[in-house]
């Protein structure tokens, strides 16, 4: 890679974070907001994407062409994109190294069906499993996840809120620790309507994410 375009908030995967920290890449951030993601502070430019929400296709194409020209990039031949699509389709299907992996992928695949519930992903290991296991190029379900310093807090309550806001069913998949942190949200008052909410709990040895972080190099494995 020589040039990276960053959209959204790509800080979940350690491998992507490492890529964004490379000094030999020309990084451009495209943003629709006043705050943007620049993980390592190496972005050379920040380009506002201020087009209207429902922009005509020809106007959007023209704006995109101007953006490419301003970055000094040349339009790639269609065969270039096709070669990458073929390469992605030829990748071996990621293997499930544990039963927790298998559950997460099964839930993801079931949620790709037409009319499937909105999918709510628990923080920590659950969302990272699917970041690793979800196949590129496949139809993705509508998925929602909490992010933040206390991402596992309120996961079930978030599912109830999604149901109330959307009026449609919600399917939540989370680890055991995330479930325990918010099990009280399964309670409801005698006059409250029962939410159309599925809660799938993966027994993944709560707090297992810490064994994948820097702490694991200084602490005995049994502590995790």
Feature locations, PLM:
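Short, intrinsically disordered, charge-balanced linker/junction segments flanking boundaries
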Residues: 1-4, 108, 219-224
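Glycine-rich, acidic loop regions that bind phosphate or pyrophosphate groups
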Residues: 1-85, 189, 214
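Structural motif
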Residues: 3, 118, 169-171
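Short beta-strand segments
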Residues: 6-8, 30-31, 120-122, 173-174, ...
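Short glycine-rich anion-binding loops that position phosphate/pyrophosphate groups of nucleotides
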Residues: 9-12, 33-35, 124-126, 177, ...
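Short helix/loop capping segments that flank catalytic or ligand/cofactor-binding pockets
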Residues: 13-16, 37-40, 129-131, 153, ...
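Active-site diphosphate/adenylate-binding microenvironment
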Residues: 79-167
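Thiamine diphosphate
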Residues: 134-224
